[in-house]
Swiss-Prot record:
SUPFAM superfamilies in UniProt: Heme-dependent catalase-like
Biological function: Decomposes hydrogen peroxide into water and oxygen; serves to protect cells from the toxic effects of hydrogen peroxide.
UniProt KW keywords: Heme, Hydrogen peroxide, Iron, Metal-binding, Oxidoreductase, Peroxidase
Entry protein name: Catalase
Start and end residues of each stretch annotated as Disordered: 1-20
Catalytic residues in the record: H54, N127
Cofactors required: heme
Entry EC number(s): 1.11.1.6
An example Gene Ontology biological process: response to hydrogen peroxide
Gene Ontology MF: a single term: heme binding
Family named by the database record: Belongs to the catalase family.
Residues the entry annotates as binding heme: Y337
């Protein structure tokens, strides 16, 4: 096999890739050295803005196979036939730290799944917890600012973290998840994934159901203690990435079983708490899990930058039979994610291979044109306006999901209150489900952070939330904080 020739970006052969052109042996370098200038300029532009959240991530390809009939609940084509397989790409991530952060840290994990269906790409952009810290997107920038590095100290500050939580009692449920054992998964393979939000399914008869997604790991749950994680983060900062890549390369393919909870739309208005509140779960006793299928990851990306860093997910990427719910946090994300990708990757990010729909030959069929890095050569007979007389793409007239009934006046509103719509009952229930060992680790983790908070009023507000969740919970955290402060 003949040796390939090294070329410039324009395709010209490179004569010397070891020495820059200069004026004599020891003279200054020449600006006419096209290869040097091009190589340095290209290097300066290798990085793009990192994600403002979920920057540190890993990903893999695989497939989703339907194992159980759910055609009575959704007419989504990729879910309509038992045995049907759909190609997928799954990106895991941490949330708060930067691209260079460690994997083994206490942080929620992103679980962003792209289904390359025959009706377009469907993105399910979830986490490894079923709930979240807040329920209104207007608080999201402030929440993330409080969790990321302080602009003065350049480090994550317990004062900021717990101060925001002190003013956000709705975060108590997710805090209990995060500070418990599942706050540090041993690997991406050994954690569950959740859609977290409530979505809408519509069947072929036009009947609608609200739905929650649960991906249960087939590898079993494995977690790290704070000490184990600190040691691993120092020894192998990319531990989760290493584990995922090596497992797939060995042929040990990680898998998850998908279950859903389904609520008839008519039941939502009278349910005992707001079913669209992402800080709460639906009790399985009310809406039991129904198995749908199996997710398997079996192929690593060839290029992490091209396929993981440039992967773009948006909760607004639906397919026929699936749509959004009135969940406020979801509604905010429907805009924010796609807008973040337009900033980070450009308006044509859907033309990148990892993001391009496979359902339409040649890419998406619409009248969007041009923009930075446009690679889709639509011209000549492809008109850039609609309607037209040239057989261009036309609308179907069929909405992806059933419409939702709304009423009331415009304005800013508190989330609707139901009989048991408080911030603490489910946090207390989660605490009481834990074993004694799990409770001890939860209390120790919380106390370790709270003991570093400088303001007593912030500590007291947080303790009040844990007392409201469960008196024993609050008392144990309070005593542990006091003991650490006395030391």
């Amino acid at each position: 096999m003949s040796q390939r020739v090294l070329t410039t970006e324009s395709g010209a052969p490179v004569a010397d890739n070891q020495n820059s052109a200069s004026a004599g042996i020891g003279g200054p370098l020449l600006i006419q050295d096209q290869h040097l200038i091009e190589k340095l300029a290209r290097f300066n532009r290798e990085r793009i803005p990192e994600r403002v959240v979920h920057a540190r991530g890993s990903g893999a390809y695989g497939h989703f196979e339907v194992t159980d009939d759910v055609s009575g609940f959704t007419h989504a084509d990729f879910l309509n036939t038992v045995g049907k397989r759909t190609e997928v790409f799954l990106r895991f991530s941490t949330v708060a730290d930067s691209l260079g952060g460690a994997d083994a840290v206490r942080d929620p994990r992103g679980f962003a799944l792209k289904f390359y269906t025959e009706e377009g790409n469907y993105d399910l952009v979830g986490n490894n917890t079923p709930v979240f810290f807040i329920k209104d997107p207007i608080k999201f920038p402030d929440f993330i600012h409080s969790q990321k590095r302080d602009p003065f100290t350049g480090r994550q500050e317990p004062d900021n973290v717990f101060d925001f939580w002190a003013h956000s009692p709705e975060a108590t449920h997710q805090i209990t998840w995060l500070m418990g054992d599942r706050g540090i998964p041993a690997s991406y393979r050994h954690m569950d994934g959740f859609g977290s939000h409530t979505y809408q399914w519509t069947n072929a008869r036009g009947e609608s159901f609200f739905v929650k997604y649960h991906f249960k790991t087939d590898q079993g749950i494995r977690c790290l203690t704070a000490d184990e994680a600190a040691k691993l983060a120092g020894e192998d900062p990319t531990s989760h990435q290493t584990d995922l890549v090596q497992a797939i390369e060995r042929g040990v393919y990680p898998s998850w079983t998908l279950h859903v909870q389904l609520m008839p739309v008519a039941e939502a208005a009278n349910y005992r708490f707001n079913p669209f509140d992402v800080t709460k779960v639906w009790p399985h006793a009310d809406y039991p899990l129904k198995r749908v299928g199996r997710l398997v990851l079996d192929r690593n990306p060839d290029n992490v930058f091209a396929e993981v860093e440039q992967a773009a997910f948006s909760p607004n990427n639906f397919v026929p039979g699936i749509g959004p719910s009135p969940d406020k946090m979801l509604q905010g994300r429907l805009f924010a994610y796609a807008d973040a990708h337009r900033y980070r990757l450009g308006v044509n990010h859907t033309q990148l291979a990892v993001n391009a729909p496979k359902a339409v030959p040649g890419g998406a069929a619409n009248y969007g044109r041009d923009g930075l890095m446009a690679a889709n050569p639509q011209g000549r007979y492809a008109k850039n306006y609609e309607p037209n007389s040239y057989d261009g793409p036309a609308e179907t007239g069929t909405p992806l999901a059933a419409p939702l009934a709304v009423s009331g006046h415009t304005g800013t509103h508190e989330a609707p209150l139901h009989t048991k719509d408080d911030h603490f009952v489910q946090a207390g229930a989660l605490y009481r489900l834990m074993s004694e060992d799990e409770k001890q680790r939860l209390v120790a983790n919380l106390a370790g952070g709270l003991s570093q908070v400088s303001r007593n009023d912030v500590v007291e507000k947080n303790l009040a939330h844990f007392h409201a969740a469960d008196p024993e919970y609050g008392k144990r955290v309070e005593e542990a904080v006091r003991a650490l402060r006395e030391d």
